[in-house]
A protein has these predicted regions:
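A short, Trp-centered hydrophobic/proline-enriched beta-strand micro-motif
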Residues: 51-59, 103
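A short core secondary-structure module
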Residues: 85-129
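Internal helix-loop-helix
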Residues: 1-52, 92-99, 111, 240
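Charged, glycine-rich active-site and insertion segments that engage polyanionic ligands
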Residues: 243-247
Length: 247
């Protein structure tokens, strides 16, 4: 519930910054917290939670967004390491992250048990990124393509069991949907507050336009929808806190 309130307030003033906070917490930290072992949690979470380190989470590829089981980024086991090759895109913090949680294919194409999650550290040889600059909005949130060229990852950086990454990702995204809903609520509330302020300032026919019924109706509708959205966000957050299914 507190997290929803924080993201809502951030969304009022800067959707891009709020999105960065959501990606860091809901996705990267959330994945390790929910599915990592104790050694992984102890190694990575303190610096991520304090803000000393920035986290990124990678699922999307150029031709696989919602259709994640068609991903082409592949990891092959070689001794005590996994070797990753491929490309991810639209990855928040891909350039600045210290820690990455990446979903890759370790089994057959279209097999939901053929995807695994790995923790990759900044500076790992073969890992590089290219910033995406042509964005319509949320430009304060860094977005980039992430390249893997024979990136070697220790076997202990596998999160959970091999082949369970897809199921892990779906659970992580459940919580992520609440954070994006809260962020969107903040954007809406910010727009509403700006609209009210302008309606009180702008004058026509000798009085503020807020006093005209047609304008008041629109503002009332906006306020009603914001209130309804806030209640739904809070309900979803409360259900998640109780361990209930929210999707």
């Amino acid at each position: 519930l507190e997290y929803v309130c924080v993201l809502t307030e951030l969304g009022k003033v800067c959707g891009g910054f709020g999105l960065s906070v959501a990606a860091h917490n809901s996705l990267c930290i959330g994945h390790i917290l929910q599915h990592g072992n104790e050694a992984q949690k102890n190694k990575y979470l303190p610096a991520l939670a304090s803000g000393e380190h920035i986290g990124a989470w990678g699922l999307t590829e150029p031709n696989t967004g919602s259709d994640a089981m068609r991903m082409q980024c592949v990891a092959k086991k070689e001794g005590n390491e996994w070797v990753i090759n491929g490309l991810k895109t639209w990855i928040t913090h891909a350039l600045s992250a210290d820690v990455y949680v990446i979903l890759v294919r370790t089994g057959d194409l279209l097999d939901s048990n053929g995807i695994s999650a790995f923790i990759i550290e900044k500076g790992t040889p073969g890992l590089s990124a290219n910033k995406i600059t042509q964005k319509v909005g949320v430009r304060a949130s860094e977005t980039a393509e992430l390249y893997f060229d024979n990136v070697r990852v220790p076997a202990e950086n596998l999160i959970g069991e091999e082949g369970k990454g897809f199921k892990q990702a779906m659970k992580v995204l459940d919580g992520g949907r609440i954070s994006i809903a809260a962020l969107s609520l903040g954007v809406a509330k910010g727009a509403y507050e700006a609209s009210v302020a302008y309606a009180k300032e702008r004058e026509q026919f000798g009085k503020p336009i807020a006093q005209f019924q047609a304008i008041s109706f629109k503002l009332a509708d906006m306020a009603t929808e914001c209130e309804a959205a806030e209640l739904l966000c809070m309900q979803a957050a409360d259900m998640k806190n109780k361990g209930m299914n929210i999707t």
